[in-house]
């Protein structure tokens, strides 16, 4: 048998996958901490009891109770809701449904969430970046100049990792610019912390608007992996063609439906109030800490701050078991670390450790 043309397993893989740098999630980056403030999770667990025991049967593709509860919560029709394995799957579904590999492009505005880029690269779709302006708002002219061949524009509001809302007038301008040309995906993963800013009321006006949501943040269910896509029925029907036949396991659907009950939503709002209170405490303390140069405004459950020696600070806290998120490699975020709002005890540990840093 000839071995001249034998390929290794790696050689058999697609070239773009061989070259792909995977998304560096908080868990993938690791660490041996006991204060985890790097993934924007809620700091304490919420307990649920499973009520569905029919694990011998396949689940519904789109569990009725989950869809109806979320539609009622979000103020949309059930036909405008799709549930998936986290909002990350929603990102991937949008690219798979709307972009031809090798022909179409997605566009996003760094510094922002990393999965838009990774999902496009995995699928083999061109990635276009239009860096945000100095105040991290949209460069509308830059976006307009790059719309030819762009099928999906991703905008994160509030933006991760910077924490600010995108100017609503700019979002309207973007939706007018893209009408009949591209889909605009508004990632509202953190919208529960500023619900007045949601774009759900705009879905009637803009058939090309899509909104991503999650249970990972304010609902305190990051381990559940449950997200939502809100859009007009025409878009949802296209996504239903490409989603897996059983995206949610029965236990996930069971817990999600409970979390979206009236009691579950009230509990979520209590958590938001608690988080906002702790965020203010953390902001005030950071502003009075010598190694902190600047604390940026936040509408979320995390704070971005610029430090005098951020790499040293990051490593020092890491060595003490306090795990933050280093943002130095993101465009325009030199010297910045992102800190999830934790419990009062966790927040105090961060402040105490930072105040012990040499300046």
Swiss-Prot record:
PROSITE patterns associated with the record: AA_TRANSFER_CLASS_2 (PS00599)
Gene name of this polypeptide: hisC
Homology family: Belongs to the class-II pyridoxal-phosphate-dependent aminotransferase family. Histidinol-phosphate aminotransferase subfamily.
Keyword GTP-binding found: no
UniProt entry keywords in alphabetical sequence: Amino-acid biosynthesis, Aminotransferase, Histidine biosynthesis, Pyridoxal phosphate, Transferase
InterPro entries associated with the record: Aminotrans_II_pyridoxalP_BS (IPR001917), Aminotransferase_I/II_large (IPR004839), HisP_aminotrans (IPR005861), PyrdxlP-dep_Trfase (IPR015424), PyrdxlP-dep_Trfase_major (IPR015421), PyrdxlP-dep_Trfase_small (IPR015422)
Subunit structure: Homodimer.
Catalytic activity entry: L-histidinol phosphate + 2-oxoglutarate = 3-(imidazol-4-yl)-2-oxopropyl phosphate + L-glutamate
Top-rank taxon, per record: Bacteria
Organism from which the protein derives: Salmonella choleraesuis (strain SC-B67)
Cofactor: pyridoxal 5'-phosphate
A GO term for molecular function: histidinol-phosphate transaminase activity
PANTHER family: HISTIDINOL-PHOSPHATE AMINOTRANSFERASE, HISTIDINOL-PHOSPHATE AMINOTRANSFERASE-RELATED
Pathway assigned in UniProt: Amino-acid biosynthesis; L-histidine biosynthesis; L-histidine from 5-phospho-alpha-D-ribose 1-diphosphate: step 7/9
GO process annotations (BP): L-histidine biosynthetic process
EC number: 2.6.1.9
SUPFAM superfamilies (UniProt xref): PLP-dependent transferases
This protein's name: Histidinol-phosphate aminotransferase
EC category: transferase
UniProt xrefs under CDD domains: AAT_like
Modified residues (N6-(pyridoxal phosphate)lysine): 217
HAMAP family: HisC_aminotrans_2
